[in-house]
Structures are given as structure tokens and as C-alpha cells.
């Protein structure tokens, strides 16, 4: 079944118009982490999708931090960046980065995608700077500043306001 889902998603990704970056939202690595043996297969399934598109690929997890073993297999996946949920579990996300490292590119989920309260650009910049302070040894080629989850379920006006705040907050970051 996992292989069939991966093949289906790979076909979907292959049919996209040209894009620069593909975000693969993957909460199940946190909420229903694969068992031993299945964690490696999950990484291979991610590879199948990532290989189907000529774009940077970000696997963005949320609703917590990834358990250690699935995280290790995700690090082996052929993706450009891993996304972390710094709203639901900032300490666990920092622990994974400090303990196991991460890719050369990173996505920071610093805006709450499940709440209609719109963060200010200053709050967003502070959160990005906080992450940088926690992992100063990591030098990232690209930092994606994003919501911790998709914004799909928010009212349109709130989702758009959060996107505007993200754009403004990213310009205020001083590293």
C-alpha cells in the first residue's frame, strides 16, 4: 500500500507545472511514526516522490517532533530540506537538529497554522532568530520560514494575513 501511495504521489508531482520547491506535508512521521523496518520504507517512499520532480523538495513534519529512528531514515532520504514544527514542539525539534544534524536547507514552522491569531512580523523574526541561537553551528544554504501546518483550514482572510506576516517577518530577521 505504501508503494502504491508513493507511486500515485510521484505521478501527481510529475504532472505539476514547473515549480521551484515542492513542500511534502508529512504529519504521520510524528503522529503515527512507522515501526522498525517500516521507517526505512517510508524514507524510500519519500524518495520515490522526490525523484519524480525537478525541484527542491522539503519534507515538512508537524504536530510535534519526529522520533529518533524515523528522523534518521528521513535524513537518508533524497530531499533538500526537512521542515520542523517549532510551534507544537520547539524543544524536540531543536534536539533533533542538535543531536543528529539536518539537511543543508531547512524549513522553520514558526507560525501556528491551526489558530486564527495572526502573528506579528516581529514575533516571526524573533522565532527564527531563536532557532538560529539554538543551532548556531548549523549553516543553512536556504531557510524557508513557514507555518507549522497547512493553512488550508483557516478562513481565507486569516490565511492570507499569516502569509503576509510570514513575508514581512522573514525580511526582519537579523542573523
What are these regions (language model features)?
Residues 1-92, 101:
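Active-site loop segments of alpha/beta catalytic cores
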Residues 18, 48, 52, 137, ...:
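Terminal disorder- and signal-encoded targeting elements
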Residues 77-172:
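Catalytic-face loop-and-helix region of soluble metabolic enzyme cores
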